[in-house]
Swiss-Prot record:
Family listed: Belongs to the Rht family.
Principal location: membrane
Keyword list, A-Z: Cell membrane, Membrane, Transmembrane, Transmembrane helix, Transport
Listed name of the protein: Homoserine/homoserine lactone efflux protein
Taxonomic placement: Bacteria, Pseudomonadati, Pseudomonadota, Gammaproteobacteria, Enterobacterales
Chain coiled-coil ranges: none
Natural source organism: Salmonella typhimurium (strain LT2 / SGSC1412 / ATCC 700720)
GO biological process: homoserine transport
Protein location: Cell membrane
GO MF assignments: homoserine transmembrane transporter activity
TM spans (from-to): 5-25, 45-65, 68-88, 117-137, 148-168, 182-202
Function noted in UniProt: Conducts the efflux of homoserine and homoserine lactone.
InterPro entries according to UniProt: Homoserine/Threonine_efflux (IPR004778), LeuE-type (IPR001123)
Length: 206
């Protein structure tokens, strides 16, 4: 893989990670409600889920999800239901302003697992990776090394972007002056979770 080819993938991966989705929403809500340490656990979970998708694509299972309507539909509806459930939970969240107290309500391990599930139940992610990776793989060169390069690049880029979203969320949290504003923010993010869940439910198999 040439540097130019890798740089083209880097730009593509960056644009994709910057696109707001369930991962970004999950990172921002976790950062606001559970502090930066909670966000770190969430980001680690997202990258774990992404890494699993990359491995599945590498061993050929990504093609199964891209070709099997049943597999796509099962994962799609599981993901949509989970995101809508997260949105409902966010709507019901207390409007407390003390982030240090909120950070104790869920362990970082639980936030980590939640983030893994958010990424794993997104069939569009694995289908897109299955379609994208081959476009940047040079058949005349060792494929395993190229998959590793693309996979590591994807994870590092997404980690940096999600860290940016977490930092932005922390700045938003600093503007919150009382419980009413926190509750309104929880409802806003809860609505976004449900919207993304609804959009995922309406997604059609290519």
């Amino acid at each position: 893989m040439t540097f130019e080819w890798w740089f083209a993938y880097l730009l593509t991966s960056t644009l994709l990670s910057l696109s707001p989705g369930s991962g970004a929403i999950n990172t921002m809500t976790t950062s606001i409600n559970h502090g930066y340490r909670g966000a770190v656990a969430s980001i680690a979970g997202l990258q774990t889920g992404l890494g699993i998708h990359i491995v599945l694509v590498g061993v050929g299972l990504g093609t199964l999800f891209s070709r099997s309507l049943l597999a796509f539909e099962i994962l799609k509806w599981a993901g949509a239901a989970y995101l809508i459930w997260l949105g409902i939970q966010q709507w019901r969240a207390a409007g407390a302003i003390d982030l240090h107290t909120l950070a104790q309500t869920q362990s970082r391990g639980r936030l980590f697992k939640r983030a893994i599930f958010v990424n794993l139940t997104n069939p569009k992610s694995i289908v897109f990776l299955a379609a994208l990776f081959p476009q940047f793989i040079m058949p005349q060169q060792p494929q395993l090394a190229q998959y590793l390069i693309l996979g590591v690049t994807t994870i590092v880029v997404d980690m940096v972007v999600m860290t940016g979203y977490a930092t932005l969320a922390q700045r938003i949290a600093a503007w919150i002056k009382g419980p009413k504003q926190m509750k309104a923010l929880n409802k806003a993010f809860g609505s976004l979770f449900m919207l993304v869940g609804a959009l995922l439910a309406s997604a059609r198999h290519a």
